[in-house]
Amino acid sequence: MEKYLNYKGISPFPDDFDNFWNEEINKVDEFFEKELKYEMIKKDFGIPFAECYDLYFNGIGGARIYSKLIIPKGTKDKKIPFILKFHGYQGQSSDWSRNIGIVASGIGLVMMDVRGQAGKSQDNGVFDGITVRGHIIKGVKEGRNKLFYKDVYLDTYLLSKIIENFEFTDKENI
C-alpha cells in the first residue's frame, strides 16, 4: 500500500500544463473584456425575499450557456457572498425551489447547466462518435484544444467572472 501513496499514474504530466491553462485563461479574460454578452431574464415566482433570473451568456466557442441566478432582494447597497453550484454528470441545474433556503440566508446562488448535458446550455462542438456518454474523453483524438471539458472549465471561469463583476457581489466570498 505504501507504494501507492505517491503514485502519479502512468501518463506523464505535460511540461507546459501551467502555460496552457494560463494562455486559455488570458484568452477568456480578453473575451470577457471585449466580447462577452450576457442576458438576464427576470422570473416572477412571487418569492418575497428573492429575485430569480435566467442568465444566458456566450461561452467558449460561441456556445449559449444557461444558468439560474437567485439573489436576495434588497442587495443594492450590500455586498453578498455567492455560491456557484453544479449538477452531476448528465444532469442539469436543480429546481429553483430546492435552493431557495440558501438565498433566504443572504447568499446569492448561480447554477450553470453544463453544455451538452441534460440542461438548457448549448453544445456547439463537433465530435465524432458517442455524444450521450463519454464527455470525459471527447476531443482526446483531436488534441487538448478540442477537449470537451476544457471548454466546460472555461465556461465555469467565465461565469465566475460575470458573478464577480456584479456590483452587489462580495468578491472575496465566491
Regions found by a protein language model. Give the residues of each.
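N-terminal targeting or regulatory segments adjacent to alpha/beta-hydrolase or S9 domains
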Residues: 1-50
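The serine-hydrolase catalytic nucleophile loop
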Residues: 89-103
